[in-house]
């Protein structure tokens, strides 16, 4: 009896002490915003391996179209990936490389019929072949972080089937008659008659191989799931002995003659719609001087086991909006695009880790012994983050970089 009374007495006295042991001090929203803005300033410079902002130079009157094209493609790709992750309830990988990646765009080469060259595409009823020249990037083979193949699917109102499953293959160099001639990469179900859309495929392994072995670069093959039969995507049913042609049409691959034979007005309209939608590769490379820093000091992974489902209540931990205007908030003129972005931040109260009705003094004592400098109550921190693409100038040289973990999308108590 005396033991129970003593335990209760100690518990009531130790719990308030535990609740006060927090390294997360209460700040007003203005102070949160100021700290977040300064943190972003340091983040951007750090990720670009800059000790200070580049010197101010007069902004160019007009950014070259090819530079804008790379920026737009990279930005759109990131937005598409974010939308897919949100739809699938997936999170960005927490072990994303910290430093910024340089982005390069390689368009599919176009050859005139009169040129004595192998055309980059071949028309076949059941597949298309696409080739890229990546020889200029061979010296950077070891720095490749990611490669994406992007192709724009055109609307085909004359398609005989509404849906098709298309597959992407890497064409292999055959050593003998028994060796495989292609390697599967990915597949997508597309709506042939729907409005056009960009399709993206992760081709990092294939491009990495091409950069190290030039003779193995035989291109990609876009084909039907089963050209010798008919595949019904809605129920994964295959109808044998019924050939199905590739009804999906792709900008820069399928000629305008597919849509109009002799109709100059329609040909001109189609060319206008497909302008700027050439199939291309987006290569993301980590420069050597950043690669060395990345290998020497890896960031710690964010803990994922302490996630807290926060409520959207003003006083509780939740996502707070914060728009950063580079010129107004940071005093920077050297970032050309975007002019600003929604950085956001996390703030609010978190429920305490211990309470008098769920924990005992021995547990609290053990925790404090193991983690003497740790907070006894959780803090509101970021959980899901997304990258940001920027276009900036160093002198007269335009550069496009992808900065990881710059946009806070959700929060947790940890």
Curated annotation (Swiss-Prot):
The keyword Secreted applies. One of its GO terms (cellular component) is extracellular region. InterPro entries: Cystine-knot_cytokine, TGF-b_C, TGF-b_propeptide, TGF-beta, TGF-beta-rel, TGFb2, TGFb_CS. Keywords: Cleavage on pair of basic residues, Disulfide bond, Extracellular matrix, Glycoprotein, Growth factor, Mitogen, Secreted, Signal. Disulfide bonds join 309-318, 317-380, 346-411, 350-413. Residues 1-20 form the signal peptide. Gene3D superfamilies: 2.60.120.970, Cystine-knot cytokines. One of its GO terms (biological process) is positive regulation of stress-activated MAPK cascade. GO terms for molecular function: amyloid-beta binding; growth factor activity; protein homodimerization activity; signaling receptor binding; transforming growth factor beta receptor binding; type II transforming growth factor beta receptor binding; type III transforming growth factor beta receptor binding. It holds the Pfam family TGFb_propeptide. Glycans are attached at residues 72, 140, 241. Interacts with the serine proteases, HTRA1 and HTRA3. Interacts with ASPN. Interacts with MFAP5. Belongs to the TGF-beta family. PANTHER family: TGF-BETA FAMILY, TRANSFORMING GROWTH FACTOR BETA-2 PROPROTEIN. This is Transforming growth factor beta-2 proprotein. It comes from Mus musculus.
